[in-house]
């Protein structure tokens, strides 16, 4: 009896070993078809086409094409590919290769290696795409330019139907050399989490960091940037009807050829209360205007009417955006010069409109404030800065306070008050 159970169990394992990969292969094929439909329906610049699909028990092969479109010009770039699929018990691994290879005919950018693009999918719908680029060297003889680097890795994690994606990248080094300038990047990393909120609007959190960037012009002094980072965060508010967005750019050090090291530098940008529906309308209207301009270039007799309608739609959607209320600006600006720090902030707010007041002019409701403080020595010692600040000082828009030049301005009721000097503004909308 025990022997019979062992034989039966072994038989079940054999059947499962055959059936499960086959079932996985079937589901993988369905997932690719569904993924293509989702990608093609979510935007207009990329189209995934899946053609012949030969499915086997433990592996499959299929061919397809990627179409990259420029929405403004209508130009297309077609990239045909072949894919080899290995089936497992809980998922599949797909290896993609361009039909025409990774490099133009006669070129050897990657030496004996080649990039590898794979996608690992699971039965429950999750997927991980990974692009691995080996060490490379690309030379453009026409422009006398060379690009070479250590290679890198890019990963994209997502799920079918989830409208969420995580992106990461790691690029140790990249050099762009030409007769005019050499550019060297070191340790570039990216971490980005994204979720679709509505239409073309995505929210999430991300960080882009670069350990160093060296710029070496042929006819000027070299500049080195160390510790450059960009942080962004967008989140939905008011039951997903609006969003807040924040961006921070930081630089630890700026090293000049003379040996001076300046830093740290910081610039922050904030956007609050952006209406999602109105912003989607703005995006659609701008796209329509670009398409109409392209149609006009190709002699479409209806293009002028399309352009006029698109311009009208842009104006209406912008008015709806402002009527919903918003706040935008740079709450913190901190830059370091050889003569001391430059500090400031710029904030603009619109309270929004209610009821019949939506049809009123928008500009009168705008309010804002601006502050700027720069070293007096910077204006005195730097000719370019002096030429820019001299007219402002003469008109009282910049005032001297100790060893600083100050500008304080407020905007309210169509009056811009700069250092106590009122400047009436015309209504623009």
Model-derived features: positions:
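Positively charged n-region of N-terminal signal peptides that target proteins for export
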Residues: 1-5
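Glycine-rich, small/hydroxylated-residue low-complexity segments
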Residues: 6-8, 16-429
């Amino acid at each position: 009896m025990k022997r019979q159970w062992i034989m039966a169990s072994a038989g079940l394992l054999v059947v499962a070993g055959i059936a499960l990969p086959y079932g996985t292969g079937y589901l993988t094929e369905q997932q690719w078809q569904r993924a293509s439909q989702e990608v093609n329906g979510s935007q207009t610049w990329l189209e995934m086409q899946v053609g012949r699909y030969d499915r086997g028990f433990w592996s499959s092969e299929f061919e397809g094409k990627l179409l990259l479109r420029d929405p403004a010009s209508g130009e297309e770039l077609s990239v045909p590919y072949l894919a080899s699929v290995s089936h497992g018990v809980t998922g599949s691994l797909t290896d993609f290769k361009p039909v025409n290879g990774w490099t133009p005919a006669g070129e050897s950018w990657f030496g004996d290696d080649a990039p590898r693009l794979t996608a690992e999918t699971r039965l429950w719908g999750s997927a991980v795409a990974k692009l691995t680029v080996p060490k490379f060297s690309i030379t453009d003889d026409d422009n006398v330019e060379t690009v070479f680097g250590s290679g890198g890795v890019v990963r994209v994690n997502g799920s079918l139907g989830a409208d969420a994606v995580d992106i990461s990248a790691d690029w140790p080094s990249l050099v762009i050399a030409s007769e005019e300038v050499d550019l060297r990047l070191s340790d570039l990393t990216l971490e980005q989490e994204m979720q679709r909120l509505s239409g073309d609007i995505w929210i999430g959190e991300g960080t882009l960091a670069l350990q160093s960037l060296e710029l070496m012009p042929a006819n000027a002094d070299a500049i080195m940037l160390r510790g450059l980072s960009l942080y962004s965060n967008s989140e939905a508010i008011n039951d997903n009807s609006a969003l807040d967005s924040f961006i921070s750019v930081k630089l630890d050090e700026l090293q000049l050829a003379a040996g001076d090291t300046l830093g740290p530098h910081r610039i922050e940008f904030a956007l609050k209360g952006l209406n999602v529906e109105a912003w989607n309308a703005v995006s659609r209207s701008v796209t329509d205007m670009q398409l109409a301009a392209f149609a006009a270039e190709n002699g479409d007799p209806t293009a002028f009417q399309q352009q006029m309608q698109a311009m009208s739609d842009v104006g209406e959607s912008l008015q709806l955006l402002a009527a919903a209320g918003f706040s935008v600006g740079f709450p913190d600006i901190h830059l370091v010069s050889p003569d001391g720090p430059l500090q400031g902030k710029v904030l603009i707010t619109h309270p929004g409109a209610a009821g019949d007041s939506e049809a009123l002019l928008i500009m009168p409701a705008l309010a804002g404030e601006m502050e700027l403080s720069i070293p007096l020595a910077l204006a005195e010692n730097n000719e370019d800065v002096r030429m820019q600040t001299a007219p402002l000082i003469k008109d009282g828009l910049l005032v001297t306070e100790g060893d600083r030049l100050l500008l304080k301005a407020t905007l309210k009721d169509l009056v811009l008050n700069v250092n106590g000097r009122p400047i009436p503004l015309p209504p623009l909308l």
